[in-house]
Amino acid sequence: MATIKDIAKVAKVSQATVSNVLNGKDNVSSDKIRRVMKAVEDMGYVINEKAQNLRKGTAKILAVVVPNLYDKTYIDFFSSFKDYAERKEYTVDLYITNDDDDYERKQIQKIKSRMTEGVAVFTSISDGSEAYYEAGFSNEDVVFISNKQPYNCKFIGYDNIEAGKEIAKKILQGNYEKVALLTGPLTYSGKMDFRNSFLESIVKSDKISEVYERVTTEQCKYQNVVRVFTHMQPDAVVTDSISLAQTVKSVYQNFYRNKPVDIVSLSPVYTIPERDIIRYEIDYRKMGIDAASYLINRNWENRNELIIESKGFSDWPKINSKNEENVLNILSIASPTTRALKTVVNLYEFNTGIKIRITESDYESMYKLVKNRGAELPYDIVRMDKDWFPVLAKSVFEPLTNIESNIGNSLDGFLPNALKNYSYLDGDIYALPGTPSIQLLFYRKDLFEDTRLKRLYYEMYKKSLEVPKTFEEYNRIAYFFTNEFNNESPIKYGCSFTSGEPGTVGVEFLMRYFSHSKRLFDENGNILLNTEAARDALRETKDSWNYSSKIEHNWWTDSAWEFAEGDTAMGIYMINHVSGFVGPDSKIRGKIGWSIVPGDNPMLGGSVLGVSKYSKNKDIALDFLKWISRDDIGTATVLLGGMSAKKSAYDDAEVNDAYPWLDYAKKCFKNAQTDYYPIVDGDNIGLKELQNLLGVAVKKGIMEHLDIDEILETAMTDYENLKKKKL
């Protein structure tokens, strides 16, 4: 086996240099780093992590202890815990106890031997706190989940007593006479609290004629479920875990379907509905995040417990349709959100009997159709680009207050300024936010953190390789990562650039312009292109194009996919086009970071949803818009690859596990650039028209290598001609 001494000899450096390189220190030249890493690879050297941790005095290791990994409760907790911890550069070890207290005691010794800094545990030991403290862990090192311990300890859980009362209340509201209660071992305090609370609430009522109780382990759950059905024909079965509920469902559907049975259960959160189980939901993903956050930050100060508010019963109610023969026709821009919408509407059809027909159109074709046909569009609902909204809304949409006068009173829970930017026009509500989107900078975190590349960048520029805050920095880094200009770069292109359509080139210019100036027009409607801000933005646009692949991508989805293929260092994208970054074909999963765009003045994008003036089903169309704007539907849409305007979707732990940049994006909406264009005698100059004319001038100038002032003069002339047409 190769040693550090062997590596040093092959790389022709000192052993101290090898040690510095392996420990990620940046005080070594890029050439020596390259030689050391090549020797490491050629000789198959494996770093001794335990020895490395001993030298550092810390291991940055956390542990999660769970009974099993087939119950979604523990899967949700562990996945969120692990994602959070790994983003903080911690390693997470998983230990499975199979609900065996003796086996868990043995695992505790292994956990301690790994120099583990903190443990989150669903313990199987009745006095688990004592067992962990005896092994050498302090009160601060272990957080117990769901089940409180007899000793003073850190604890995260939910209100088991309240959950028992709420499920009992649900049972008493139903037409049930015979009820079965199936729980796990009552040696756990949380399960005992739930059981006692449920039964105490039930016995106070005379509505239930019989309650049959069974206690089971996971290993015996099938035979105990069978005992329930052979003892009685229950009207409802209550369980304290989703695993037991799914077992009840399986046994019932296969062997006892002669009589309807409702299954009511404590459950982790399901973003996508489960129709066969009535679920009282607990957010174990949030518990996982909170547990990891505590163990890393130790920020609880004078408290010992955190009680998570239960989400309660999942609410997917049936909607009473005014006419089950109705069909709603929807016209939509083709996008990932439209694909998600096609799936979500199946639930609406199931619950209402109303058929939904969605017609997709590409961006340019739909713009021409909507602009030319206006109110004559043969659709009930139109999903149009946010940029068209100020110009086309009044000719296409029925004001929603004409359909429901107090509609504004029911619009809550949206992202900051979403209603202002996506719904209101001249003081009236013409649409609901469809898919609010915002620009984010995405970059290859693995490359930005590579020790050799960081050193090489410093040697070239005498500056640290950091996430760019200006487009000058952005282009310097893009140049560095473009292999054509720097053969030390491991990838081909420094940045992406969407240049296939004039409108997208216009956006490339505008995002850079708005990093220098908040306004593109003066108070008289004159375009501010004869300015240093415009000249700087155009230079930066031309440079960025030079550091890109120069492939003429027609839309943001195409350039985002190029980034996902792994040959580009960074790019700026609207967040409604980037779900592919974590897709099965992505080569950058787990390798990306994200930040506010350079200049801290991002542009908005996305779509709005409105009721067509043509529609003969305006009431039903508005009901659909309100349904699609619900918190639960919004969260499901995002999880399926779309976007939502609801804050709850961005706060959902499962959504943030899937698309971890969304929590950050939510905070950026308040900084978004919205003052794009002026009013000319009461008529808006549409942003699409503005982007197109800018894009035509900029693209022509780049391709033909025109002088910067000449390009800007062309754009100003085109704008003045457009303004005259409006007048």
Where are these regions (language model features)?
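N-terminal helix-turn-helix/winged-helix DNA-binding helices
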Residues: 1, 41-79, 88, 113
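N-terminal helix-turn-helix DNA-binding module of bacterial transcription factors
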Residues: 1-58
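Flexible loop/hinge segments that line or gate small-molecule binding clefts
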Residues: 122-162, 265-278
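Flexible loop/turn connectors
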Residues: 230-320, 324-325
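Extracytoplasmic/periplasmic substrate-recognition and gating elements
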Residues: 329, 584-650, 674-680, 696-699, ...
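Hinge/lid segment of periplasmic solute-binding proteins
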Residues: 386-440, 591-595
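Glycine-centered hinge/linker elements that transmit conformational signals in sensory
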Residues: 475-481, 512, 516-554
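C-terminal capping/gating helix-and-loop segments adjacent to ligand/active sites or protein-protein/ligand interfaces
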Residues: 552-553, 662-720
